[in-house]
C-alpha cells in the first residue's frame, strides 16, 4: 500500500506543529492561511525550506500544518521540525542528511520557572544590609 499523506509532529518551546505532507507543488498552508499571511512579511522562511533543500525534495510536497502555542518564532521552528520528521516518514533514506543538518533534534530549551523567594528564575530581590 502506497501512502500519499505523511504526518508528523514538531515542537519548540510551547509551540506544537501538526504537519501533513502530500505530494504536490510546494505550497505551505499554516492554520488555513498562506505562510506569508500567517507569519507576516518578515519571518524565517529559509527555516521552512531547509528540510526540503537538505533532502532535495523542494517543491515536491505540499504542507498542511496546524500550529498552536508559543510565539511566531517558536512556531516556525516547530514547523521546520515537523516537516523534517514528516520527510523522514516519506523516505527513510532522508534520515542521514536531516540528521547531519540537525533538523531531527528537538530544541528542548524552554523558559525556566520563577522560584519563590526570588524575583525571577535566577534574579534575586535586591539585598539591603540595613
From Swiss-Prot:
Which domain of life, per UniProt?
Answer: Bacteria
Keyword Disulfide bond appears in the UniProt entry: no
One biological-process term from Gene Ontology? translation
For this UniProt record, the keywords arranged alphabetically read as follows: Ribonucleoprotein, Ribosomal protein
**Which GO molecular function terms does the record list?**
RNA binding; structural constituent of ribosome
Region feature Disordered, mapped onto this chain: 109-130
**What are the annotated GO cellular component locations?**
cytosolic small ribosomal subunit
Family affiliation: Belongs to the universal ribosomal protein uS9 family.
Which NCBIfam families does UniProt cross-reference here?
A: PRK00132.1
Task: Quote the protein name from its UniProt record.
Answer: Small ribosomal subunit protein uS9
| Organism, scientific name | Desulfotalea psychrophila (strain LSv54 / DSM 12343)
**Record gene name:** rpsI
Amino acid at each position: 500500500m502506497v501512502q500519499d499523506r505523511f504526518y508528523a509532529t514538531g515542537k519548540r518551546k510551547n509551540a506544537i506543529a501538526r504537519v501533513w505532507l502530500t505530494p504536490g507543488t510546494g505550497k505551505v498552508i499554516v492554520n488555513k492561511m498562506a505562510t506569508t499571511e500567517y507569519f507576516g512579511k518578515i519571518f524565517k522562511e529559509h527555516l521552512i525550506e531547509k528540510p526540503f533543500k537538505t533532502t532535495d525534495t523542494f517543491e515536491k510536497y505540499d504542507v498542511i500544518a496546524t500550529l498552536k502555542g508559543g510565539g511566531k518564532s517558536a512556531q516556525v521552528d516547530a514547523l521546520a521540525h515537523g516537516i523534517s520528521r514528516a520527510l523522514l516518514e516519506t523516505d527513510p533514506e532522508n534520515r542521514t542528511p536531516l540528521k547531519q543538518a540537525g533538523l531531527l533534534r528537538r530544541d528542548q530549551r524552554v523558559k525556566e520557572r520563577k522560584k519563590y523567594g526570588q524575583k525571577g528564575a535566577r534574579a534575586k530581590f535586591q539585598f539591603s544590609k540595613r
